[in-house]
Amino acid sequence: MSKEDFVIKPEAAGASTDTSEWPLLLKNFDKLLVRSGHYTPIPAGSSPLKRDLKSYISSGVINLDKPSNPSSHEVVAWIKRILRCEKTGHSGTLDPKVTGCLIVCIDRATRLVKSQQGAGKEYVCIVRLHDALKDEKDLGRSLENLTGALFQRPPLISAVKRQLRVRTIYESNLIEFDNKRNLGVFWASCEAGTYMRTLCVHLGMLLGVGGHMQELRRVRSGALSENDNMVTLHDVMDAQWVYDNTRDESYLRSIIQPLETLLVGYKRIVVKDSAVNAVCYGAKLMIPGLLRYEEGIELYDEIVLITTKGEAIAVAIAQMSTVDLASCDHGVVASVKRCIMERDLYPRRWGLGPVAQKKKQMKADGKLDKYGRVNENTPEQWKKEYVPLDNAEQSTSSSQETKETEEEPKKAKEDSLIKEVETEKEEVKEDDSKKEKKEKKDKKEKKEKKEKKDKKEKKEKKEKKRKSEDGDSEEKKSKKSKK
């Protein structure tokens, strides 16, 4: 045979599926790093966009264009009444007069409210200055100065305590300025909890003319902006009316988005179907349950655990970095921070190993009691191989006893030292208690002396007063007798 026969020749491999157009959390699925390609698909759950209407609504979010005048809580309560759902929440309060992006979470999606409330926000604001500026470029310059970490105190009329706090303005741009009407329009990207009203007042102070906020609109809240399928309250009401009267789901499905839209920015870890329900019950994700993972995951990063169908299971804290995930063959991948998926949507798959199955069979045959404990019918081999938890504890206790006998002289020394230290501490405590008692006694005596002194002085004053009154009366009598 010639040497050429043993050369590995290139093969025409088929092109991998293009997942750049796949929806939500499955986008660019092929670019995830593969830990294992082997798993058993379970016919449970469904793709977020193909859920039945009831579960689609109960795990949905609405990117609402909040109208001016009603408060955020009122708007959310109206949506709850319109959609007839159990609970609703929103992504951060907007003042009654403020309009724009308000993310309304429904039922299961309310578990993501906290993460959205802490996310960054973007606003377009109209500021009214109290006087004309000498140089129109001053407004842009002072806006640039007001970036980074700023001290802010909540406005006079606010629902929170007016404490000084630090808030960050990431970026701001002046859009337009009319010096004749003293009006300026600017855009700002800032941290959650920033007061734009206070920012406008600070702008006026910097410019030396004074100013206040005229109008405000939020254009982005967390993951969603005003360009991401924003709807009005009328749309929500019309969609529910159309469904009630014509049974047409399309309008409702178009205004409500799956909760996975809020998690698109998180790094992903794909979980085997058999491990999903265990994670829903709060179990940590281990290496055997891992299918794919994203590049650039660092230790303690906030990540999202997803199923092979693209459903969000939970928001979790990574316990391994990408490098560890590639090299480790056992260990904890992530611990659950906030579970999103319903329990028992996927079937239970724990307790299905060979030992667990054998134990189950032996219980049925009467070779173990109903609690899985050894009885008279248990085979000797099982007793040798399988060590239950209480036996393990007994064995550890016996080993501890042997260790204790060896370490008795050491312990005696340690105990004597500890006793000495304790006696010293007790003596110090006694001295302290004596001092305290003495101080209390002295204080009491001083107080009593002071009270006695005060009483004596009062008595003397009364006597003096009485004597002076008696003297006056005698003088009057003598005068009358002379007359």
UniProtKB/Swiss-Prot annotation:
There is a cross-link at K9, K267 (Glycyl lysine isopeptide (Lys-Gly) (interchain with G-Cter in ubiquitin)). SMART domains: DKCLD (SM01136), PUA (SM00359). InterPro entries: Dyskerin-like, PsdUridine_synth_cat_dom_sf, PsdUridine_synth_N, PUA, PUA-like_sf, PUA_sf, tRNA_PsdUridine_synth_B_fam, TruB_C. Residues 434-463 are annotated as: 10 X 3 AA tandem repeats of K-K-[DE]. Residues 362-373, 408-436, 466-477 have a biased composition (Basic and acidic residues). It catalyses: uridine in 5S rRNA = pseudouridine in 5S rRNA; uridine in snRNA = pseudouridine in snRNA; a uridine in mRNA = a pseudouridine in mRNA. It is found in: Nucleus, Nucleolus; Chromosome, Centromere; Cytoplasm, Cytoskeleton. Present with 33600 molecules/cell in log phase SD medium. Belongs to the pseudouridine synthase TruB family. This is H/ACA ribonucleoprotein complex subunit CBF5. The gene is CBF5.
